[in-house]
From Swiss-Prot:
Similarity-based family: Belongs to the long (4 C-C) scorpion toxin superfamily. Sodium channel inhibitor family. Beta subfamily.
SS bond partners: C33-C84, C37-C58, C43-C64, C47-C66
Signal peptide: 1-20
Domain remark in the UniProt entry: Has the structural arrangement of an alpha-helix connected to antiparallel beta-sheets by disulfide bonds (CS-alpha/beta).
Cellular compartments annotated: Secreted
Gene3D superfamilies in UniProt: Knottin, scorpion toxin-like
Domain LCN-type CS-alpha/beta: 22-85
Name the record gives this protein: Toxin Tpa5
Predominant cellular place of this UniProt entry's protein: secreted
Length: 86
């Protein structure tokens, strides 16, 4: 018996079509850098508006980090995204 179908089934449990499976830093439109956040309330709004993510919080470096970002929205560090131009 192959373990592949079982592993695949476990990966897909709970994931509905269109449901995000990743987290990440939203990208600034101006310079492609991570986005600064003064507080979690601002970050949550940034995540909704910039990354179409339902939630987010400020990390330890006051950078906005979003949860459940849709796969079609680029986040910082994705292949093909331009480097941060500070």
């Amino acid at each position: 018996m192959s373990i592949f179908p079982i592993a695949l089934a476990l990966l897909l449990i709970g994931l509905e079509e269109g449901e995000a499976a990743r987290d990440g830093y939203p990208i600034s439109k101006n310079n492609y850098c991570k986005i600064y956040c003064p507080n979690t309330k601002v970050c949550k709004e940034t995540c909704k508006n910039r990354a179409s993510a339902p939630d987010g919080e400020c990390d330890g470096w006051n950078l906005c980090y979003c949860f459940k970002v849709p796969d079609n929205i680029p986040v910082w560090g994705d292949p093909g995204t331009p480097p941060c131009m500070t």
